[in-house]
């Protein structure tokens, strides 16, 4: 049931919204996916060679290039600094697996990008450690909180208002009582700040969210990961009932974000269908899938449908009920969320592991889905 959908569907001033992208606003978007039933190894650790093969196949498919080196160079040029944004908050099982980030790093280095020009980053060091990134040699890890910090000059303003707390850049410590701080004298703001990593340190971003639900946004995916997942004063977007949907779409459309994110690869090796964006291993299923697209909206729309399917099996409300920001992003021209405007295409591999003829194929008949494995 879990994969049935896949195969059946086979400065302080708000930035102006970018014009609709011609490849997503008026044409169908393509979400490529790679499946491997053997990708998850012992002790819930993905097998690196299989992950690397899947990533190489996806990058060739997305770009239409014949080799991974040529594919990576179509996104990142030598001398550019690239930030690989991961989603480590859901933990070692439900979050972005280090093997996926490592495959991207190795692919970029093989394509001629200096290792010193590549960073792997997220909001908190403790999340990266919990997810196992500190155990992978050669990764240049960076984090925002208690690390690089937020940029006081990179302000994002929206209509959503939130209460500032300790850790937000504009929060001012007070000697008042807790009741005063949380009551009428609470510090309120409609501003958030971009992290210095994004505003100053990197030229391009490869976003690697995981296939994880979110209590706040339905899916903790491409859009949420590059908005709620990186800003301070993010709680103002997560009050429920669609309160922050339009604002989240506005934030992602800011040129300082949307122009830097060149590719989204979603780690669907495991699907976490409840408890997100926090660790919840009991609500995870081995899924054996990676997805990739230039359209972050299409990736998130696909993820919501997969989550809805699994939550239906588990007799839970649909995740899409809290995922209104995806439709808002589509309405603002950031991509496609309509299932009829999204083409699901599978990357195929030859008997020796090479990408099959045509580099990526869509089976004419739906193959049998991988059996979901409950953890």
Located regions from the model:
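Bacterial N-terminal signal peptides
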Residues: 1-9
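Boundary at the C-terminal end of the N-terminal hydrophobic targeting segment
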Residues: 11-15
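Extended, low-polarity segments enriched in aliphatic/aromatic residues
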Residues: 16-78, 89-91, 95-102, 106-375
């Amino acid at each position: 049931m879990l994969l049935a959908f896949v195969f059946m569907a086979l400065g302080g001033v708000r930035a102006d919204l970018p014009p609709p992208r011609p490849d997503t606003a008026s044409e169908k978007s393509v979400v490529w996916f790679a499946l491997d039933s053997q990708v998850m190894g012992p002790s819930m650790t993905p097998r690196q060679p299989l992950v690397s093969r899947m990533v190489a196949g996806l990058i060739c498919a997305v770009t239409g290039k014949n080799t991974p080196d040529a594919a990576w160079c179509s996104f990142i040029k030598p001398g550019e600094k690239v930030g690989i944004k991961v989603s480590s908050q859901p933990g070692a099982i439900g979050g972005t697996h280090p093997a996926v980030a490592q495959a991207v790093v190795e692919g970029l280095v093989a394509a001629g990008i200096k290792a010193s020009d590549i960073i792997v980053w997220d909001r908190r060091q403790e999340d990266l450690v919990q997810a196992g990134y500190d155990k992978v040699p050669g990764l240049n890890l960076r984090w925002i909180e208690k690390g690089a910090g937020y940029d006081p000059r990179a302000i994002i303003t929206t209509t959503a208002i939130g209460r500032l707390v300790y850790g937000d850049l504009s929060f001012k410590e007070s000697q008042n009582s807790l009741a005063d701080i949380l009551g009428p004298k609470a510090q309120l703001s409609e501003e958030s700040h971009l992290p210095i990593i994004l505003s100053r340190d990197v030229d391009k971003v490869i976003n690697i969210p995981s296939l994880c639900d979110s209590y706040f946004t339905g899916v903790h995916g491409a859009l949420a990961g590059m908005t709620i997942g990186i800003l301070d004063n993010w709680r103002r977007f997560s009050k429920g009932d669609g309160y922050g949907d339009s604002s989240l779409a506005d934030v992602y459309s800011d040129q300082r974000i949307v122009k830097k994110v060149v590719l989204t690869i979603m780690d669907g090796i495991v699907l976490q269908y409840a408890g997100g964006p926090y660790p919840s291993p009991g609500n995870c299923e081995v899924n054996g899938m990676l997805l990739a697209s230039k359209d972050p909206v299409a990736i998130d729309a696909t993820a919501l449908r997969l989550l809805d399917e699994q939550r239906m099996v588990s007799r839970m409300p649909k995740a899409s009920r809290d995922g209104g920001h995806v439709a808002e992003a589509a309405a603002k021209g950031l991509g496609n969320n309509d299932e009829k405007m999204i083409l699901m295409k599978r990357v195929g591999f030859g008997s020796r592991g090479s990408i099959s003829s045509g580099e990526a194929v869509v089976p004419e008949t739906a193959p049998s889905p991988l059996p979901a494995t409950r953890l």
